[in-house]
């Protein structure tokens, strides 16, 4: 049985429990607290307080999310879209992607290597299949084209 979130102390405790498990964005944390029965009038001041204390940080959340999703084999376009769906500001997302130290070409090459065992497409059908896969994963079309045509060979 879950506790009723009708006091600032209960909301703060629940928010800190959630933040102890992993970083959360403000919008995501608000949604989770609402689902547990907290009201917006009580949520906002507590989240403001957590942010002032440095316990709730959008920048840390962005960095953590980008590191996790890129490590799972997703590219910048897919990550950008997922963060946008989570209610984060487009400018903050773009800045976090620029500041991330992810080598997207290397990441795309690793994903392609795992999926297709390094076999470049021999016909239009297999090229389309590999292109769709990498595009779905969120890698830019120009990078995909260079990889599949072999123009990036000297980099790997």
Swiss-Prot record:
Alphabetized UniProt keyword annotations: Cytoplasm
Database matches in InterPro entries: RecX_HTH_1st, RecX_HTH_2nd, RecX_HTH_3rd, Regulatory_RecX, WH-like_DNA-bd_sf
Any one GO cellular component localisation term in the record: cytoplasm
Compartment(s): Cytoplasm
Pfam families, alphabetized: RecX_HTH1 (PF21982), RecX_HTH2 (PF02631), RecX_HTH3 (PF21981)
GO BP terms: regulation of DNA repair
Similarity remark: Belongs to the RecX family.
Chain's role: Modulates RecA activity.
Protein known as: Regulatory protein RecX
Species whose genome carries this gene: Pseudomonas putida (strain GB-1)
């Amino acid at each position: 049985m879950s506790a009723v979130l009708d006091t600032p102390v209960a909301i703060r405790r629940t928010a800190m429990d959630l933040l102890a498990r992993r970083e959360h964005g403000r919008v995501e944390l608000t949604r989770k607290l609402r689902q547990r029965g907290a009201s917006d009038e009580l949520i906002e001041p507590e989240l403001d307080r957590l942010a002032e204390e440095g316990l709730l940080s959008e920048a840390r959340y962005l960095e953590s999310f980008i590191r996790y999703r890129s490590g799972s084999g997703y590219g910048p376009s897919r990550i950008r879209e997922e963060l946008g769906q989570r209610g984060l500001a487009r400018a903050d997302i773009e800045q976090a992607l620029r500041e991330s130290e992810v080598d997207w070409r290397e990441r795309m090459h690793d994903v392609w290597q795992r999926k297709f065992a390094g076999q470049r497409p021999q016909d239009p059908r297999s090229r389309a299949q590999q292109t769709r896969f990498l595009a779905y994963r969120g890698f830019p079309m120009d990078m995909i084209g260079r990889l599949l045509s072999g123009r990036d060979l000297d980099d790997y």
